[in-house]
Every structure is written in C-alpha cells, then in structure tokens.
A protein has these predicted regions:
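Sec-dependent bacterial lipoprotein signal peptides
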Residues: 1-17
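Short alpha-helical catalytic segment bearing the HExxH-like zincin motif
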Residues: 113-114, 128-136
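C-terminal capping/extension segments of zinc metalloprotease domains
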Residues: 19-49, 54, 63, 81-89, ...
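Catalytic zinc-binding patch centered on the HExxH motif and its immediate surroundings
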Residues: 94-110
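Active-site metal-coordination segments of metallo-dependent hydrolases
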Residues: 60-69, 159-177
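Active-site His/Glu-centered metal-binding helix of metallohydrolases
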Residues: 132-142, 174, 178
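Zn2+-dependent metallopeptidase catalytic core
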Residues: 68-86
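Catalytic Zn2+-binding segment of zinc metalloproteases
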Residues: 122-127, 136-153, 187
C-alpha cells in the first residue's frame, strides 16, 4: 500500500501548488498510483456483476430516468474535478438491491450497488450519500480490490460479493483519506465521510454483514478523526441535515420507497 500513501502525498502537494500558483495541475503525474490487480483479475471481477444480478435472490428495483440522471450528475462532478486520477470517459451503471441489510459495494468499470436498507435507514441526507458513494468511485476506477479466489459458479450471492470486495484495514484507511481529498476537490463537504464511518460504528449489529469484523470500524473512526484534525478541520463532530438535500435526492428516496 506504499503506492496509496504516495498518492495521498501527491494530492497534498498538488493542492498546495494549485492554491499558491497558476501551475497547470495536469503537470503532476499520477500514472501508476494505486495498487492494481492484474488485468485478467479486474476483468473477472467486473464480470461478476452479471453472475450476481443473475442470482435468483438478487432483486433490483427499476431506476427512474431522473434517479439515473441524479446519480450520473454526482458521479460526473466527482470525476470531472479529479481527472488527474479518475476517468470521465468511463460511464457508470447503478443498481439498487432490495435487501434488509445495509450495504454498498462497487466493481471495476464503474459498477455501483446500493441496498434499499442502506438508503432508507442511513443515507438520509445527500451529503452522506455522496460521501459513501465517493469511496466506491475511487475504488472502482483505480481498481482497489484485494485479489481473491473466484470460483466459476455461475452465480454470486450478496454475501459473496461483499467478501470479494472487502479490503484489508490498512488499505481501507488509506482509501478513506483518498476519498476525503476527492470530495474536497469536487466541492463537497468532505467531513461527511466521517459521519458515514460513525453511522457504521454506531450500528454495528445492523452492518454486521457489510463490516464483518465490527472491531475495526471503531479504530477506523478514531484514525479518520485524527486525519481530519491534521488537515486543520475544526468541529469534526457534525450532523448533516436531511432538509438540506436537493429535490433530486428526494426523488431518489421516493424511487427506493416505491420499489417501482
């Protein structure tokens, strides 16, 4: 994970340079940053989406055009403001899965999966939704996944997909810091990502399937608070008001609630 640490240092340097001079940010070379699996593994992991969606227990809800537009707008804003590391030409696909447990995960090629329970019970403000989503955008585009054995079963359950996309703690910690910078550069309130971590930590029983080991999330919150303090962020304990969300976000919530 030394390469991810290198990336974070480069972002800090790049941010300082962009603020102190008119230097073109494209002169900073981010090529090769991130720990990437082999292309064959990336292709196999990306293709697992088909096996997951084909599994009889995987039930998706139909996304309305305005929901898709809203999700694509967030994606475009995140990516377009971070083109040193993210590719705007890669178009996303979104799936909302009917499931009683809260979870989200991504696969390579900008494929994103959210559970209905996560959106309805926990991501009730737009800033929180964007914060959780941003980490998966980073992972998907930079291929930040652990290499695991993938048996050709022809189907994958939700539990298996979460296992396939789970990260080691040290990697996850660095992705969290990476996500902070991506949110900040896109003009979002990056402190919302701390709230997303805290939500998981306060509801470990509900997030048991997603987290696996619930002990790590407390450490994750502690380390991210320290990281934010080092960034000069004051008042890290902040709540995000649902009322501040856009009309388009409420359309997403309505789409999920209607299950149509």
């Amino acid at each position: 994970m030394n390469k991810l640490l290198q990336f974070i240092l480069l972002v800090l340097i790049g941010t300082a340079v962009s603020c102190s001079s008119n230097t073109n940010k494209n002169t900073i070379d981010y090529t090769g940053i991130g720990e990437l699996p082999t292309k064959d593994y990336v292709d196999h992991l990306a293709a697992a989406a088909g096996d997951y969606l084909a599994f009889e227990e995987t039930k998706t809800i139909k996304l309305r055009p305005d929901t898709i537009d809203f999700l694509e707008t967030i994606y475009d804003r995140l990516v377009s403001n971070n083109q040193l590391i993210l590719n705007l030409n890669e178009r996303p696909t979104f799936y909302i899965i009917q499931h009683k447990s809260p979870f989200l995960f991504s696969l390579p090629r900008s494929q994103f999966f959210f559970s209905t329970a996560l959106i309805e019970r926990y991501l009730k403000s737009e800033e929180l939704f964007v914060a959780a989503f941003a980490a998966e955008v980073v992972r998907s585009q930079r291929f930040i996944y652990e290499k695991r054995i993938m048996l050709p079963l022809g189907f994958y359950s939700t539990e298996k997909m979460i296992t396939l996309t789970k990260l080691k703690f040290d990697t996850k910690e660095q992705v969290n810091e990476w996500t902070y910078f991506v949110l900040k550069r896109a003009g979002y309130d990056a402190s919302a990502f701390l709230n997303w971590i805290q939500i998981q930590n306060r509801n470990t029983l509900d997030f048991a399937m997603y987290l696996g080991d619930s002990v790590g999330i407390s450490k994750e919150e502690h380390l991210f608070k320290n990281f934010m303090t080092k960034q000069g962020v004051l008042g890290v304990e902040k709540r995000f008001n649902e009322a501040n969300s856009s009309k388009n976000f409420y359309k997403l919530l309505n789409n999920v609630a209607s299950r149509k």
